[in-house]
């Protein structure tokens, strides 16, 4: 493995990463091979890590595994940073970069429930409130979640005729299904003035174990919307999605208080 900093420290971290990704553990020989380092240089590190309970050795097989001290450190981090707090930090970044309002929503039956938002500093921006609910079918947040459902599931969720909120609202199931096909192909959902006049939204789902559990969106007034703005926003959302889903994978999902 390539080294860029203090070599012994890097090897300690490399050992932790290797063992954390190995359900069957690793022998000293396997660690030596993976690290491209002699056993003589690894053994002192392993001995210290064992004595501090960051790793342990199974005496019958001589294989090393992640130890309880590693769990203690990890749970300490998780206790101080819930999933929602981490998402909120990413939303702050999104709003700062895009200078637009960013919202987080979860599914509540056939509605999207807004559970967090970060306001834009722009004088003209979307005005919304946490706790508000809107139909899944006409919001980008909702469509980002609906895209993971089958056509039959969608048809069973909604009536054939859908309520209109503006002249742009999708008002029938077939049109909604076409929009969801486009959402799957793009990797993000879009809504153009379907719930609010002159407001457009772009959203991506946040997945845990390959299931969408929430979605984040950016709301953009029509007069600030163009193809460049869309692409820049999508790129920022994709980066946040990767960061958040990586957090989910490492720490699980804990939608605790945002305070």
PLM feature segments, named:
Residues 5-9, 28, 63, 67, ...:
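Short, structured helix-loop boundary elements
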Residues 168-243, 258:
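Extended hydrophobic
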Residues 18, 34, 86-97, 186, ...:
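Amphipathic alpha-helical regulatory segments at dimerization interfaces
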Residues 55-57, 104-105, 206:
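A structural signal for short hydrophobic beta-strand segments in well-ordered beta-sheet cores
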Residues 1-78, 85, 245:
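N-terminal helix-turn-helix
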Residues 20, 142, 146, 150, ...:
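Short amphipathic alpha-helical signal-transduction/dimerization elements
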Residues 250-259:
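Short, highly charged C-terminal tails/helix-capping segments
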Residues 61, 65-160:
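Amphipathic alpha-helical effector-binding/dimerization core
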């Amino acid at each position: 493995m390539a080294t860029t900093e203090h070599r012994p420290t890097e090897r300690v971290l490399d050992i932790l990463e290797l063992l954390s990704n190995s359900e069957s553990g690793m022998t000293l020989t396997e660690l030596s091979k993976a690290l491209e380092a002699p056993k003589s240089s690894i053994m002192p590190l392993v001995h210290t890590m064992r004595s501090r309970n960051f790793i342990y050795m199974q005496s019958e097989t001589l294989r090393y595994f992640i130890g309880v001290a590693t769990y203690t450190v990890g749970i300490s981090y998780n206790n101080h940073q819930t999933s929602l707090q981490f998402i909120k930090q990413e939303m702050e970044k999104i709003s700062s970069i895009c200078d637009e309002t960013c919202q987080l929503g979860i599914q509540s039956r056939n509605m999207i429930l807004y559970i967090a938002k970060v306001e834009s500093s722009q004088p003209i921006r979307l005005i919304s409130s946490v706790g508000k609910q809107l139909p899944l079918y006409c919001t980008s947040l909702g469509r980002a979640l609906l895209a993971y459902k089958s056509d039959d599931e969608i048809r069973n969720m909604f009536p054939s005729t859908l309520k209109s909120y503006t002249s742009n609202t999708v008002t029938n199931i077939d049109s909604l299904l076409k929009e969801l096909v486009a959402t799957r192909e793009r990797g993000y959902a879009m809504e153009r003035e379907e719930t609010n006049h002159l407001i457009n939204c772009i959203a991506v789902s946040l997945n845990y174990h390959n299931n969408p559990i929430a979605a984040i969106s950016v709301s953009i007034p029509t007069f600030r919307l163009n193809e460049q703005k869309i692409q820049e926003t999508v790129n920022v959302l994709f980066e946040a999605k990767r960061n958040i889903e990586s957090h989910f994978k490492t720490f699980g999902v804990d939608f605790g208080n945002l305070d």
